[in-house]
Amino acid sequence: MAMGIGVGVSSCGSSSADSPTTQMNSNAQPISLGSYSSPKSARPGDWPANSGAGKSVVILGAGIAGMTSAFELQKLGYSVSILEATNRAGGRIRTIRSGDVVNELTSSQTCNFDVNGELYFNPGPARIAHHHEFLIGYCREFNVPLENFTNDNRAALLHSPSAFGGTPQVAKTVFSDIRGNISSLLASAINQNALDQALTTNDKANVLSMLRNYGDLDNNYSYSGSSRAGFSGQENVGSRDRDTQITVKNLSDLVSDTFLQSRWINFSEGYNQQSSMLQPIGGMDKIATAFRGRVASNITYGAVVKEIRKVSNSIRIIYEKNGIQTEHNADYCICTIPTTVLKDIPNDFSEAHKTEISSFVYSNAAKLAFQSRRFWEQDHSIFGGISWTNQDITQIWYPSNALGHNDGIIIGAYIWGNTASTNFSNQSPQQRINSALLQGNNLHSEYQSEVSKGISVAWRNIPFQLGAYGLSTANTLLTPDDNIIFAGEHLSILKGWQEGAILSAYNAINEITKKVHA
């Protein structure tokens, strides 16, 4: 990153000492399997070496779950094949650059971004939580360098048409005033002895001291504004008159609008959203590319699965490639096909598995991106982070890469609410652009004149995906169906995250290992 602004970069080296293949869970409780035992939370290093010798596995789908499974299984001696319906590996791990084509069921778009390695759009996963240890471990092992991803930025905006006259509010002012008002309210209750039953005398003094700092209260425990909110005129960059604080918003105004009571207020405190967040330098597909390079010889592209059959303690897959149907037989199958697609493939699944597959719900999440002069940096001092609105576009993301450069890719919409995302998905690409321009202009008045070259991805319309990530809670699908094991982010505790796909792959490998050593 050539720029004059310091940004931390975590470079994942090639050392195998900290790679996923050598990490163990010392607290895991073993499960007795005769001559073989496995921890409840299985991971590489827990499976017996060469345990797959003479056994074969067919994996349906070359996404992260499929490629993780293949990478680890072949190290155990299994003969592994991956059947991928599309012409690329990675599944929903995709990065769109100049010239790339997005094909949906009823439309096609070509990306018109300038040819520049810094100008890219991650329409699927776009961030990595710092505690997603296995994904980060693979990045280290595969030499995929990571950089900081700014998830929360107090210089970004909060907007509701029904709050503060529809004027976007700089996040730092809202957070400061919420903390200050609530702290003052609680301090007043303590000083009026309203909490005597809950607090000792020492507790009261200590809590009051904490509240004074937490809410930036004065010596009378009143809130009359804070420098944390910035200064009038130029909230994000200071002003010529540093003595003029921004007018305090009273508590009733702050809580009167349902949007200002909602998800954004604790977004960055969510377990998977807490700082530090990370992203691969150059695009999320760097991870998919690294995996692909290690299992490339195992993948058959353009292999559309037509049937999944059980045959005398083995599995037969019938797939079609270039109009020709082929049978592929294996001892075991790991199926990572999204249930939205899987439900329409003829199969021999148990009735319980079929029922859960047919009722499994996916998010209709969608994203849209524009290329633009970095007006958010140059004019508003917003460097990365997310602005929120209760319009359909929901979020605007500012890029965390190439800070200080002239142009960047701004995410003009990230929509996952069911009604809004469905409506967005039903629009034509141009209609989506038009809507995003109008709504984005309500946050940044220069928006329509600055952004261009819009491109969108509605995951419910993407062939062989038909959804963004799983929403339902799996039960039966967590169990093998004879020699068929299901995997994918939708079957993990971390739905919608690459780490979840990896954990699900580990579970699938563990199930196969238990069968082999039964």
Please give the residue ranges for each predicted region.
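Extreme N-terminal leader/targeting segments of oxidoreductases
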Residues: 1-57, 75
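Short glycine/proline-rich turn/loop motifs
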Residues: 40-42, 46-51, 112-120, 262-276, ...
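N-terminal glycine-rich phosphate/pyrophosphate-binding loop and immediately adjacent elements
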Residues: 41-185
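Active-site rim elements
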Residues: 118-129, 273-281, 353-361, 418-430, ...
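Rossmann-like dinucleotide-binding core of oxidoreductases
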Residues: 151, 165-168, 174-194, 342, ...
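Active-site/ligand-binding neighborhood in enzyme catalytic cores
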Residues: 155, 162-163, 187-304, 311-314, ...
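Mid-domain catalytic core of redox enzymes
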Residues: 301-413, 443
